[in-house]
Amino acid sequence: MARECYITGRKARSGNKRSHAMNKSKRRFGANVQKVRILVDGKPKRVYVSARALKSGKVERV
């Protein structure tokens, strides 16, 4: 469960890398997750949180 948002559950997705000739090969699109300290059950904990959750105010840093 590494590199997954603790709040929203956002994580890496798979897709295709396309060359100029439109050949395809598999690749991963990583989620923009940051390691931050937040309060979990009243105690500070270091977890991965997506940038979208941080910007929208769904979580408060400690």
UniProtKB/Swiss-Prot annotation:
The lineage of its organism: Bacteria, Bacillati, Bacillota, Bacilli, Bacillales. This is Large ribosomal subunit protein bL28. SUPFAM superfamilies: L28p-like (SSF143800). Keywords: Ribonucleoprotein, Ribosomal protein. InterPro entries: Bacterial_rp_bL28, Ribosomal_bL28, Ribosomal_bL28/bL31-like_sf, Ribosomal_bL28_bact-type, Ribosomal_bL28_sf. Residues 1-27 are annotated as: Disordered. It holds the Pfam family Ribosomal_L28. PANTHER family: 50S RIBOSOMAL PROTEIN L28, LARGE RIBOSOMAL SUBUNIT PROTEIN BL28A. One of its GO terms (molecular function) is structural constituent of ribosome. One of its GO terms (cellular component) is ribonucleoprotein complex. Belongs to the bacterial ribosomal protein bL28 family. It comes from the Bacteria. The keyword Ribonucleoprotein applies. GO terms for biological process: translation. Gene3D superfamilies: Ribosomal protein L28/L24 (2.30.170.40). Residues 10-27 have a biased composition (Basic residues).
